[in-house]
Swiss-Prot record:
This is Enolase. The active site is at 204 (proton donor), 336 (proton acceptor). Catalyzes the reversible conversion of 2-phosphoglycerate (2-PG) into phosphoenolpyruvate (PEP). It is essential for the degradation of carbohydrates via glycolysis. Pfam families: Enolase_C (PF00113), Enolase_N (PF03952). It catalyses: (2R)-2-phosphoglycerate = phosphoenolpyruvate + H2O. Belongs to the enolase family. It is an enzyme of class 4 (lyase). Binds a second Mg(2+) ion via substrate during catalysis. SUPFAM superfamilies: Enolase C-terminal domain-like, Enolase N-terminal domain-like. It is found in: Cytoplasm; Secreted; Cell surface. SMART domains: Enolase_C, Enolase_N. (2R)-2-phosphoglycerate binds at residues 162, 336, 365-366, 387.
Length: 425
């Protein structure tokens, strides 16, 4: 009854107006699953590879080749298979691709099918996706990392860091956490406007003002938290995504906005000072993806008091994560389904992290869709943290809204992770 009888891939648009892959999977009993694949702007060199068309159509970014793979090779390989055997289906697709980075079939083709299969199987089981994937113990609602000021590759302004985030660690529910975030977001908008800054938003819904450096952005956020009636550090903590690989050049960190250059040790000390001066509890990609020595120095410096998240460093890859664990580098992994390209491998990365005492943060990409799968996966894995943008743009709020629904559905079983999500607090 749960055999796959039809798979349909199509080309749709993501939140940046670029093409992406959407996949429908239909089972023998009529159950249906649909998944749309996200895409990143700042991508790690070690990520699984998307299949794009090249040429002039959509300026080379079309995904007709990936859609053709879904409707052809992938359909032929898994039609008739049991959708409830996720591991076997994912492994079949990985073997069919045959490359180390999914460059033959395309991670966008494989992932779309992998997620749609899980959704169809969940429907066939009569279970919500978070319960189907996570089992009876899936009940933890994640603390959101809300990206309210954008810089770097996500915005057209002088700020070198990519994201400045707020974390409502003092809230008691996801519903309350979303309210905290919304109130600070709107307060920040007014303060920026009153100070003469533009209030246009970047790819992830955060503001992109022309501020001179990280401290200026953090000061605006601190003032807005207080003005909204919250206590910085107690009700709402701060987080950074430096995306340091983007400004790592010839062994140094080149801050073009500040017109400063820092070597790896100076970079680590700069981040340590920011974490000391502000209630920063999490720093993502503070060092470049292949600057392992810099990462080690940063981890030794502040890893016992600040969450250090590897995004480009680990690219949701269990093998790279195990290298980091062995070297004592970072203490957390950012989990992006399209970085690795299948649901099974995503879950494996979270499990590997948790077994080693590392935290895991479920994450969106800057190019998103209305698909809210990652909200379910955050609850399914009990990872306790989610990164899904600001409090604007429906591609971001779709995930918050899904978390609110899940919390309501869980009722008294639901537990908001709060401060406990960050083990060091």
């Amino acid at each position: 009854m749960t055999a796959i009888i039809d798979i349909v891939g199509r080309e749709i648009l993501d939140s940046r107006g670029n093409p992406t892959v959407e996949v429908d999977v239909v089972l023998e009993d009529g159950s249906f699953g649909r998944a749309a694949v996200p895409s990143g702007a700042s991508t790690g060199a070690h990520e699984a590879v998307e299949l794009r068309d090249g040429g002039s159509r959509y300026l080379g970014k079309g995904v007709e080749k990936a859609v053709e793979v879904v409707n052809g090779k992938i359909f032929d390989a898994i039609a008739g298979m049991d959708a409830e055997n996720q591991l076997l289906i994912d492994q079949t697709l990985i073997d069919l691709d045959g490359s180390a980075n999914k460059g033959n079939l395309g991670a966008n083709a494989i992932l779309g099918v992998s997620l749609a299969v899980a959704k169809a199987a969940a429907q066939a089981s009569g279970l919500p996706l978070y319960r189907y994937v996570g089992g009876t113990n899936a009940h933890v609602l994640p603390v959101p990392m809300m990206n309210i000021i954008n810089g770097g590759a996500h915005a057209d302004n002088p700020i070198d860091f990519q994201e400045f985030m707020i974390l409502p660690v003092g809230a008691t529910s996801i519903r309350e956490a979303v309210r905290y975030g919304s109130e600070v977001f709107h307060t920040l908008k007014k303060r920026l406007k009153d100070a003469g800054h533009n209030t246009n938003v970047g790819d992830e819904g955060g503001f992109a003002p022309n501020l001179k450096n990280a401290q200026a952005a953090l000061d605006f956020i601190m003032e807005s938290i207080e003005k909204a009636g919250f206590k910085p550090g107690e009700d709402i903590a701060l987080g950074l995504d430096c995306a340091a690989t983007e400004f790592f050049k010839d062994g140094n960190y080149v801050y073009e906005g500040e017109r400063k250059t820092r070597d790896p040790k100076a970079q680590a000390k700069y981040l340590a000072k920011l974490a000391s001066d502000y209630p920063i509890v999490t720093i993502e990609d503070g060092m470049a993806e292949d600057d392992w020595e810099g990462w080690k120095y940063l981890t030794d410096l502040i890893g016992n008091k600040c969450q250090l998240v590897g995004d480009d460093l680990f690219v949701t890859n269990s093998a790279r994560l195990r290298d980091g664990i062995r070297l004592g580098v970072a203490n957390s992994i950012l989990v992006k389904v399209n970085q690795i390209g299948s649901l099974s491998e995503t879950l494996d990365a979270v499990e590997t992290a948790h077994k080693a005492g590392y935290t895991a943060v479920m994450s969106h990409r800057s190019g998103e869709t209305e698909d809210s799968t990652i909200a379910d996966l955050a609850v399914a894995t009990n990872c306790g943290q989610i990164k899904t943008g600001s409090l604007a743009r429906s591609d971001r709020t779709a995930k918050y809204n899904q978390l609110i629904r899940i919390e309501e559905e869980l009722g008294k079983q639901a537990r908001y992770a709060g401060r406990s999500a960050l083990k060091l607090l």
